[in-house]
Amino acid sequence: MVLTPRQKEELNKAIADYLHQCGFEDTLNAFKQDANMPGELDKKYTGLLEKKWTSVIRLQKKVMDLETRLSEAEKEVHHGGGPKKTRSPEDWIPRPPERYTLTGHRSPITKVLFHPVYSVMVTSSEDATVKVWDYETGDFERTLKGHTDAVQDLAFDHTGKFLASSSADMTIKLWDFQGFECIRTLHGHDHNVSSISFLPSGDHLVSASRDKTIKMWEIATGYCVKTFQGHGEWVRRVRPNADGSLIASCSNDQTIRVWVVASRECKCDLRDHDHVIEDLNWAPESATPVINEAAGVEGGKKAMSPGPFLVSASRDKSIKIWDVSAGVCLVTLVGHDNWVRAVMFHPGGKFIVSCSDDKTLRIWDYKNKRCAKTLVAHEHFVTTLDFHKSAPFVATGSVDLTLKVWECR
């Protein structure tokens, strides 16, 4: 491509300005003489060369992203024997490459969570901060500071007005997500608070800790109103079911316990993992028929189970689906090459998504007990993931300090 005389003149002036800004005066004078540029430098060309350079890099990255997407689409068309029908939202799964790679945390990311209403997400980190990001534009919005040690988990109430954070500093903080102020700090655990969740009603929180207990907190007063004891080691995660009548917890003691909130009684004790259980989540109603189908294939069962069902992820590299009412493991998914750090059901119910220390994000067709897609997601351990409940996005966070947003289609 040949530059026009005007473009050449502008390029020369931009180069001259760059040499001047860098203090290369001898080179500048020689260049001005060779390029026949007498007189003072024009201020309108200040910084132009750097701007052009960064624009080229940005465009080059976009071109590479588009080429990767085109290649992915061509592969799908080739393997599918022709253009596929548009997938319905329950079939959407994350596709490479990532839409955004976001940086800002100074230590490993421990949790990523989409806001239930706004187009923002929050992350927590071992750097003791919580950060807010716009997942549609990739813009960083703000940092919430207050904890004095690693922030381990985050939770929104169903309205999205309140955010709760739990930390290795042994506290839980409640944030007004409209004013971004800490409105209450809850004290009571004797060790690292590894997990936090709002009950669906929004008036109570449940937390899990390395002190081996689970606590329930009244939000209006900040008081601990119940303590659940029974795990023999660090309680890693606690999650309430859809109506808030049950809570499930998993632990370093390799068990999952399901508790009746009203009575604090342990309804069942699920054992089949043979290492620390890192994460668990309840199955949505949309998953019930698929789970029954998967269990029928595996166990030859015909009777439909109403559930409820759980999915768990462990350092034994496996993912398990559990029938809480029967107290049994229905399905085991194997394929990760290292600890599985986070797991959840796809909102449509057909898939399970997981992330691992093997640096991958995996999508499981659990009805057929196979991994449907593997994405090499990060350059280090992938510690956390979230699947947006209604928009086609998945977010992942890693020990490599990056947060990635993946589009689903």
UniProtKB/Swiss-Prot annotation:
Q: Which CDD domains match?
A: WD40
What InterPro entries does the entry give?
Dynein_regulator_LIS1, G-protein_beta_WD-40_rep, LIS1_N, LisH, PAC1-like_LisH-like_dom, WD40/YVTN_repeat-like_dom_sf, WD40_repeat_CS, WD40_repeat_dom_sf
Could you give one GO CC term from the UniProt record? centrosome
Q: Name one Pfam family in it.
A: LisH_PAC1
Q: Which GO terms describe its molecular function?
A: dynein complex binding; microtubule plus-end binding
Record-linked PROSITE patterns? LISH, WD_REPEATS_1, WD_REPEATS_2, WD_REPEATS_REGION
Give the SUPFAM superfamilies listed for this entry.
Lissencephaly-1 protein (Lis-1, PAF-AH alpha) N-terminal domain (SSF109925), WD40 repeat-like (SSF50978)
Specify the protein name.
Lissencephaly-1 homolog
Domain LisH, which positions?
7-39
Say what the protein does: Positively regulates the activity of the minus-end directed microtubule motor protein dynein. May enhance dynein-mediated microtubule sliding by targeting dynein to the microtubule plus end. Required for several dynein- and microtubule-dependent processes.
Q: Where are the WD repeats?
A: 104-145, 146-187, 188-229, 231-269, 272-332, 335-374, 377-409
Residue runs in coiled coils: 54-80
Q: Name one GO biological process term.
A: vesicle transport along microtubule
Family to which this protein belongs: Belongs to the WD repeat LIS1/nudF family.
Q: Where in the cell is it found?
A: Cytoplasm, Cytoskeleton; Cytoplasm, Cytoskeleton, Microtubule organizing center, Centrosome
> Which keywords annotate this record?
Cell cycle, Cell division, Coiled coil, Cytoplasm, Cytoskeleton, Microtubule, Mitosis, Repeat, Transport, WD repeat
Q: What is known of its domains?
A: Dimerization mediated by the LisH domain may be required to activate dynein.
**What's the superkingdom here?**
Eukaryota
Where is region (Disordered) located?
Answer: 72-95
Q: What is the lineage of its organism?
A: Eukaryota, Metazoa, Cnidaria, Anthozoa, Hexacorallia
